[in-house]
């Protein structure tokens, strides 16, 4: 299989996608932890690997892969083991359609995640250090986003819109999951992996939209994926934000009340 290196952060959102994919495939790899709260993705040594300053980055036999969703499709097809990509052309189309929709709708969740979790973590740094770290971000767009997030300047309107978008999206997922156990059909695919990596924590992040009473099929889908051996094995390597997965798994009955938590 060759040498496999993954440069990424927690098993959370885009950063977690290749970790779940490699675990599902049973591929051994070297995990290079890039701490986003220390802005390590913008350090000169990392920018030599990925000039965009984003995570994740996969290196397989010297070839560099970026962009988390196509990266996971590469992982599925390049290595032996379980296939995450359907062979049937129509099912493959549906898989890619759902992956694209997840990537579009994850932007709203990113706003909430930054406001609730990452922003407070980053703001622990001295203002002068934070300003210096933001200044070295390669793109103007990302510099503005990090500045907004780190200064807690998302408006109430932005936050309300983000919550509404996430609520609409999870309701749409729930409607689909009322028809089949997974997003594409009866089998777990890359669409589920990508969606789970981004939306695994909704019962904690937006409980008003992601309760069992409101979206029971989504909650049952969460249970199915949390029970996959690759899922909890991946979260076992989390150091900070990803550890909340154990709290959620307990809250929905996947783990006993006193399971792993830190």
Region annotations inferred by a language model:
Residues 1-139, 252-253, 261-262:
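GST-like domain detector, emphasizing the conserved glutathione-binding G-site
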Residues 39-40, 76, 195, 242-244:
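Short secondary-structure boundary/hinge segments and terminal tails
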Residues 76-80, 178, 226-227:
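Residues at helix-coil transition
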Residues 106-223:
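GST-like fold's C-terminal all-alpha helical module
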């Amino acid at each position: 299989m060759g040498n496999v290196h993954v440069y990424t952060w927690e098993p959370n959102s885009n950063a977690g996608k290749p970790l779940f994919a490699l675990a599902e495939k049973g591929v051994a790899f070297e995990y290079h932890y890039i701490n986003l709260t220390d802005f390590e993705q913008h350090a000169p040594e990392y920018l030599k690997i990925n000039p965009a300053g984003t995570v994740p980055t996969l290196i397989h036999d010297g070839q560099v892969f970026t962009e988390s969703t196509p990266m996971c499709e590469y992982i599925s097809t390049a290595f032996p083991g379980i296939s995450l990509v359907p062979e049937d052309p129509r099912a493959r189309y549906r898989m890619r359609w759902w992956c694209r929709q997840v990537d579009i709708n994850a932007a709203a969740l990113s706003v909430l995640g930054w406001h609730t979790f990452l922003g407070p973590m980053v703001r622990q740094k001295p203002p002068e250090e934070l300003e210096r770290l933001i200044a070295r971000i390669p793109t103007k767009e990302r510099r503005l986003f990090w500045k907004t997030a780190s200064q807690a300047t998302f408006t109430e309107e932005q936050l309300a819109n983000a919550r509404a978008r996430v609520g609409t999206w999870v309701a749409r997922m729930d409607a689909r999951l009322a028809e089949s156990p997974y997003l594409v059909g009866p089998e777990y695919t890359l669409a589920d992996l990508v969606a789970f990596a981004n939306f695994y924590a909704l019962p904690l992040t937006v409980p008003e939209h992601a309760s069992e009473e409101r979206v029971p099929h989504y909650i049952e889908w969460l249970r199915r994926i949390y029970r996959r051996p690759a899922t909890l094995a991946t979260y076992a390597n989390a150091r900070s934000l990803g550890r909340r997965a154990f709290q959620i798994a307990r809250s929905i009955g996947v783990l006993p009340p006193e399971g792993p938590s830190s």
